[in-house]
């Protein structure tokens, strides 16, 4: 559906995109994640040639956009919609007129425009806001208008540029649910860029990680746990791992005591097995659970535990071996000193 081949883009001699090669399947929700300045927005803008790449090919639905005339490119863009962090609504126009704008620019007749908007308003849950102005809407409602406007010309591709980063958590959840519904309802291919792993894990089937203008990893979310060195996996674990309280970190030493502090990452079936209680009995060791969190994405349950063990080096080694045999990732954070030292 979308194929990027050897894409390069530079600004003032500095590479923003460096040899990007990527294939996005028709009908999937694909995430691109990375820190600010990684090149995510530039990549997205190159997909619809808002930024023209210096080198490479952008093939959408079998058509190389880089080789099209200006007129043919304008026609091809009718099937590529885009929403942004900022909603870009016309404040002097009603919800109806904001959604109608792209269709009017294309010369679609008013009766067809009315029918399309009446179809879209229930989808974005704005049936009662047709005559409202942007100043009368919440941030989430404004983004819903922007989404309806993007869908008005029946695109095959929807590009989302940090579309939830200006929204509160509850509204973000609602917008992500809406995007997922749109994907299921219309079969639209969605490309979503973000710096938040939580957004990716909520709705994406596959993702790419960008670092300094390069794609360093592309994977299905369900395969993350099979790749111990996966950067995406590390980003996920960092998100779900509870932060250690100061009262604990100030008591940690890097030399061995008989109170090792260990972080455990579970996934899949391992997250539902009573591993801690079984191991405590079998190794005859005390295991004190200090922090825990569990989450679920793409049908996979994953969790993290921070535990304090009562174990000498040999017993700690036996514990780590048991974890590894069970498919549990282990990280020794340090050794707990007695309180007051």
Curated annotation (Swiss-Prot):
Principal location listed in the UniProt entry: membrane
Cellular compartments annotated: Cell inner membrane
Similarity remark: Belongs to the ABC transporter superfamily. Methionine importer (TC 3.A.1.24) family.
Family annotation (SMART domains): AAA (SM00382), NIL (SM00930)
ABC transporter domain mapped to chain residues: 2-237
One Pfam family cited in the UniProt record for this chain: NIL
UniProt GO MF annotations: ABC-type D-methionine transporter activity; ATP binding; ATP hydrolysis activity
GO CC term, one of those recorded: plasma membrane
EC numbers on record: 7.4.2.11
Matching PROSITE patterns: ABC_TRANSPORTER_1, ABC_TRANSPORTER_2, METN
InterPro entries, sorted: AAA+_ATPase (IPR003593), ABC_transporter-like_ATP-bd (IPR003439), ABC_transporter-like_CS (IPR017871), ACT-like_dom_sf (IPR045865), MetN_ABC (IPR041701), MetN_ABC_transporter-like (IPR050086), NIL_domain (IPR018449), P-loop_NTPase (IPR027417)
Subunit (UniProt): The complex is composed of two ATP-binding proteins (MetN), two transmembrane proteins (MetI) and a solute-binding protein (MetQ).
Binding residues annotated for ATP, in chain numbering: 34-41
Keywords: Amino-acid transport, ATP-binding, Cell inner membrane, Cell membrane, Membrane, Nucleotide-binding, Translocase, Transport
Reaction catalyzed: L-methionine(out) + ATP + H2O = L-methionine(in) + ADP + phosphate + H(+); D-methionine(out) + ATP + H2O = D-methionine(in) + ADP + phosphate + H(+)
Superkingdom as given in the UniProt entry: Bacteria
Described purpose of this protein according to its UniProt entry: Part of the ABC transporter complex MetNIQ involved in methionine import. Responsible for energy coupling to the transport system.
Entry protein name: Methionine import ATP-binding protein MetN
Membrane topology: Peripheral membrane protein
